[in-house]
From Swiss-Prot:
Localization annotation: Secreted
Name of the protein in its database record: Conotoxin ViVB
Family: Belongs to the conotoxin T superfamily.
Modifications after synthesis and translation: Contains 2 disulfide bonds that can be either 'C1-C3, C2-C4' or 'C1-C4, C2-C3', since these disulfide connectivities have been observed for conotoxins with cysteine framework V (for examples, see AC P0DQQ7 and AC P81755).
Pfam families: Chi-conotoxin
InterPro entries per record: T-conotoxin
Keyword Signal in record: yes
Main location, first listed in the record: secreted
Species whose genome carries this gene: Conus virgo
GO molecular function, one term: toxin activity
Expressing tissues: Expressed by the venom duct.
Amino acid sequence: MRCVPVFIILLLLIPSAPSAAVQPKTEKDDVPLASFHDSAMRILSRQCCPTIPECCRVG
């Protein structure tokens, strides 16, 4: 019976713990995705085959 108050206190503390999903989004988080997309488009346009021009028009 001595563990019941400790268990209740722990249950009350769990919702107040900070979550990783609550962290604010910064501008630095967007940069890698944008540069990744640009790099992918550059690679696709570079590897375009001359016999099939439709493969060049991606995006």
